[in-house]
From Swiss-Prot:
Belongs to the amidase family. GatA subfamily. Allows the formation of correctly charged Gln-tRNA(Gln) through the transamidation of misacylated Glu-tRNA(Gln) in organisms which lack glutaminyl-tRNA synthetase. The reaction takes place in the presence of glutamine and ATP through an activated gamma-phospho-Glu-tRNA(Gln). InterPro entries: Amidase (IPR000120), Amidase_CS (IPR020556), Amidase_dom (IPR023631), AS_sf (IPR036928), GatA (IPR004412). It is an enzyme of class 6 (ligase). The gene is gatA. It catalyses: L-glutamyl-tRNA(Gln) + L-glutamine + ATP + H2O = L-glutaminyl-tRNA(Gln) + L-glutamate + ADP + phosphate + H(+). Heterotrimer of A, B and C subunits. This is Glutamyl-tRNA(Gln) amidotransferase subunit A.
Length: 477
């Protein structure tokens, strides 16, 4: 087996025993990138020189010598951070995001920045301002989004792990499509300092990895209070690896009836239910539960997220950094032309929608109502988690669709139906592979937990991973 096929914890063990050197590990991944990147297109920037230079001053931490990929909306000092948008082309931040700083402090090495839907707006990575990323399991299919580059890089062996961001499913959905593990932590568990904002009350950074153990390892490093982020929660640090036990005996698992009653792909439903049966065999108690307000989650999300985006994206004007239009005979026309030329269609669509729902006369009818619905959804989850340890659903209603197939924006928005409620409520959730459809495309299962219930979802995910033996499955490129 090649080094690029190994997990983070397997590489770490080899490095600690000095059976391989950090140089050999790094070379293995760049060699793999050279072999398959033209097909996958997971990266927008590769940082070979920076990575090799960092070997000379490598810190002896928990990730010493481990190369990682970073989504292109997470700030990296002196390295292009474009959000896959023309408007931020050539922008190099003067600082590292807190998560990047923490990875470096533990000896992590940045391989490069991964492709994404522009400003994290999309579910296919087709909205990238550069090029679409391809699913390593079938290159004609989408890897999901918006963290499609991160998920594809991990699945293709172009990185042992990656960071993504999740606003409405952007870590979990591509993880499901690419057959890897994607963890969206509790809102406030991981610092957002240095994350380019899409919807500030929904965004959260998390890991995408080959197995559940690696997700726990990366969460150990990136989680924790950060005074630079006012939404970061100051609580005692946990060691998430202590939850990696193959044991769900007596655990109460809820299946939300509002999810399972929806009309979605039968192969996805069958594989998820068969995985749930494995947990029952392992001693878990599985019961149906109700989240009555969940049906309004998608509508509320597509009001709140664009509203926050229209405010956050107002800062891109061509004056201080990024793209500036050469057309225009006044400051006002320069602003207008810069934004018209610099933003892609999906970003413009969401800015316009957000501006509309925040405008006078419509604020109460849309934005205020959506926030009230958000409270009801949070209360639904809080009520259910009084009696249940975790909830389980499919991660996505379908497996990966073909690139160019999903042309209707509303249809694309519907694909977030299982993931969005988690962000609305601010709770943690993980997507783990649970099988394949008849076309050999991966299927993901989502495990949701209460606020700061990462331990419970990791324990459930780990047990499932052991039962299904999915972590050894890799695409052939």
């Amino acid at each position: 087996m090649e080094l690029y096929d190994l997990t983070i914890h397997e590489l770490r063990d080899l490095l600690r025993k000095e059976e391989v050197s950090p140089e050999e590990v790094l070379d293995s991944f760049y060699k793999r990138i050279d072999e398959v990147e033209d097909k996958v297109k997971a990266y927008v920037t590769l940082t070979r020189d920076e990575a090799r230079n960092s070997l000379a001053s490598l810190k002896d931490g928990r990730l010493a010598g481990i190369p990682l990929a970073i989504k292109d909306n997470i700030s990296t000092r002196g390295i292009k951070t474009t959000c896959s948008s023309k408007i931020l082309n050539n922008y190099k931040p003067p600082y590292d995001a807190t998560v990047v700083k923490r990875l470096k402090e533990e000896g992590g090495i940045t391989l490069g920045k991964t492709n994404m839907d522009e400003f994290a707006m999309g579910s296919s990575t087709e909205n990238s301002g550069f090029y679409p990323t391809h699913n390593p399991w079938n290159l004609d299919h989408a890897p999901g989004g918006s963290s499609g580059g991160s998920a594809a890089a991990v699945a293709a062996g172009e990185a042992p792990g990656a960071l993504g961001s999740d606003t409405g499913g952007s870590i979990r959905q591509p993880a499901a499509f690419c057959g890897v593990v994607g963890l969206k932590p509790t809102y406030g568990c991981v610092s957002r300092y240095g994350l380019v904002a899409f919807a500030s009350s929904l965004d959260q950074i998390g890991p995408i990895t080959k197995d559940v153990t690696d997700s726990a390892l990366l969460l150990n490093v990136i989680s924790g209070h950060d005074p630079m982020d006012s939404t970061s929660v100051d609580r005692e640090k946990e060691d998430y690896t202590t939850y990696l036990k193959d044991d769900v005996k007596g655990m109460k698992i809820g299946l939300p009836e509002e999810y399972f009653s929806l009309d979605f792909n039968s192969e996805v439903k069958d594989k998820v239910m068969s995985a749930v049966k494995e947990l029952e065999k392992a001693g878990a108690i599985v019961e149906e539960v109700s989240l009555p307000n969940i049906e309004y989650a998608l509508a509320a999300y597509y009001i709140i997220a664009p509203a926050e985006a229209s405010s956050n994206l107002a800062r891109y004007d061509g004056v201080r950094y990024g793209y500036r239009s050469e057309n225009g005979d006044s400051v006002r026309s320069m602003f207008t032309n810069t934004r018209s030329e610099g933003f892609g269609d999906e970003v413009k669509r969401r800015i316009m929608l957000g501006t509309y729902v925040l405008s006078s006369g419509y604020y109460d009818a849309f934005y205020l109502k959506a926030q009230k619905v958000r409270t009801l959804i949070k209360e639904d989850f809080e009520r259910v988690f009084k009696d249940y340890d975790v909830l389980i659903s499919p991660t996505t209603p379908t497996t990966a669709f073909k690139l160019g197939e999903m042309t209707d924006p509303l249809e694309m928005y519907q694909s977030d139906v299982f993931t969005v409620p988690v962000n609305i409520a601010g709770i943690p959730a993980i997507s783990v592979p649970c099988g394949f459809d008849s076309n050999n495309l991966p299927i993901g299962l989502q495990i949701m937990g209460p606020h700061f219930g990462e331990g419970k979802i990791l324990q459930t995910a780990y047990t499932l991973e052991q039962a299904l033996n999915m972590k050894t499955k890799r695409p052939k490129l």
